[in-house]
Amino acid sequence: MEVSNLPTLQDIPLPWQQDIWRSLTARLAAAKLPHALLISGEAGLGKTLLATAFARLALCRSPVGDKACGSCTSCSQFAAGTHADFNRIELEERDGKAGEDGQLKSAISVEQIRDLIGSLLLSSSRQGGRKVALIEPAELMSISAANSLLKTLEEPPADTLLLLVTAAPGRLPATVRSRCQSVALAAPATAVALDWLNARQRREDWPTLLGFCGGAPLAALDVAATGIEERRKAFFTALARLRSGEANPVLLAVHPKDAYPELLKLLWSFVSDLILIQSAGTRAPLVNRDQLPLLQKAAEGINLRSLYAYLDRIQAAIQALDTSANRELAFSVLLSDWATGLEELNNAPLAAHTAWGWT
């Protein structure tokens, strides 16, 4: 069943964004906004919606309370994507080479940032208010682009607001981060997220989907709409077949390029559940509780140290997704490790696991 009632700008702030929204709008009303905000948080928390709604409010000529009016000339132009004082910088499409139609470039270019700076510096506000720029995903600015933006962050034009949106603030240069005021979104309490999800569609599997998505409600909505349940069960069955020698890891690793983020996330949730079973037993809060018999069997004969080391490798593969030239090979290596029962990882060095998690 397709999920309906996806959030829009009219729904902002979402329940878990209300405190941040109140703080931002109060500073806007008091004319105490910094020149640049770094809005961060994991995927699926509505960062871009929040930033876009705030940009619209900052440009609105007749705000109603802490919301944009939606009917003034500024709001009408914003909705139409024609507001002369609003710039959105995002990944551009590739240049149409064979097999690349519709695909996005891997980085925000220095040319895009230079064009933005030119717009901010060389022209005054067309409507007599402020100028707003939204850069997303900010962590994908090239080094040259980030360096080009730095001068503007150090000496911002008057009446200009820069909104940098990112799911990975650590990938931005420290010099850029230090010149922005941080606005960090956190995942809501599970009860809050489930109430919000069930208000849009009643589903018994929301707890599983929410856990799979690291507690991010919009990500849970997204995966629910893609029919992930059948793919999840099929993938876990394939992992069981790998352990029993009934499947070939090289063949199982062959997928379309855009499938690997989901597959790695599934593998991460599978292994993290095995760690919970090994360390806390079957009453632990498992993401994939509906697959408990399969998980219990998978946990047999594998020690906790090996599972932690394997989780480190999965996390490294996740973090390398944007730069990995051969996702299939990297995924094949992970599946081969699993097929051998993680034997080579028994004495592997471990990263710190005081706060490991999906990012």
Segments (PLM) and residue ranges:
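Structural recognition of the conserved hydrophobic beta-strand(s) that form the central parallel beta-sheet
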Residues: 132-136, 149, 160-166
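Charged, glycine-rich active-site and insertion segments that engage polyanionic ligands
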Residues: 1-57, 65, 121, 158-161, ...
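Catalytic acidic motif of RecA-like/P-loop NTPases
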Residues: 136-142, 147-154, 170
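Clamp-loader machinery-focused feature within the broader ASCE/P-loop NTPase space
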Residues: 1-144
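Residue-level recognition of specific faces of alpha-helices
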Residues: 71-74, 85, 119, 137, ...
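Short, structurally constrained coil/turn elements
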Residues: 80-82, 156, 176
